[in-house]
Regions:
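...the same signal can extend to comparable exposed beta-sheet modules
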Residues: 1-195
């Protein structure tokens, strides 16, 4: 089952759920396509996450068939700020492995954000700080209002605005860490991580 950009969800929480027919599911709450959403994964299926427990802010994708969720895959580990190794690289491209496809993810800390363009660095120095030297900056179009603000400390996911994106130029050490969700290199969603 192919996964695409229309199924990207920012994970909030999961719980066991039993419906009126006594069928068991994993109830997954998240933010998808500009709204809060709940999906139900049959108990005979598992979330593909390489054994990692999902936490608020992780990015997942799901696939439905005949109205039922058939597959859930973890793409981004928010706590580690790394793309998950879930074996779905043929379905999505991460940080520079950009191809003209229906789904790409770009992550890093914001160096500058102005006039619909964002410069990111995904390279860290030996001290663990983002390196904003010219060779490490990548430029992307970023003209969307589909913005999500993830507070990892308080475990909340809320709608955000463009003014929530803080750049290194303006905020120095308080620059935003973001993930851009793109389709055919057009930014469809910005996920901002704080806390």
């Amino acid at each position: 089952l192919k996964l695409d950009s229309s199924s990207v969800m920012v994970f909030i929480d999961e719980a066991e759920y039993v419906d009126d027919n006594n069928d068991e599911y994993t109830k997954i709450d998240g933010w998808s396509s500009g709204t809060f959403k709940t999906i139900y994964l049959s108990s005979d299926k598992s979330i593909e996450s390489k054994g990692k427990t999902l936490e608020t802010g992780d990015i997942i994708r799901y696939k439905t068939l005949n109205g039922k969720v058939r597959r859930v895959v973890m793409d981004f580990d928010a706590s580690e700020e790394v793309f998950a190794e879930t074996g779905v690289s043929s379905d999505a491209y991460f940080n520079g492995k950009v191809k003209y496809s229906s789904l790409q993810f770009q992550s890093g800390q914001v160096y500058s954000y102005d006039n619909g363009f964002i410069y990111l660095s995904s390279v860290k120095d030996s001290a663990g700080n983002y390196d904003f030297s010219y060779k490490n900056l990548r430029n992307f179009g970023c003209d969307t209002d589909n913005i999500i603000l993830v507070d990892r400390k308080n475990k909340t996911v809320l709608p955000g605005t463009r003014s929530d994106i803080r750049s290194y130029i303006d905020s120095k050490n308080k620059a935003s860490t973001v993930v851009l969700v793109q389709s055919y290199l057009v930014t469809k969603q910005v996920i901002i991580y704080v806390g």
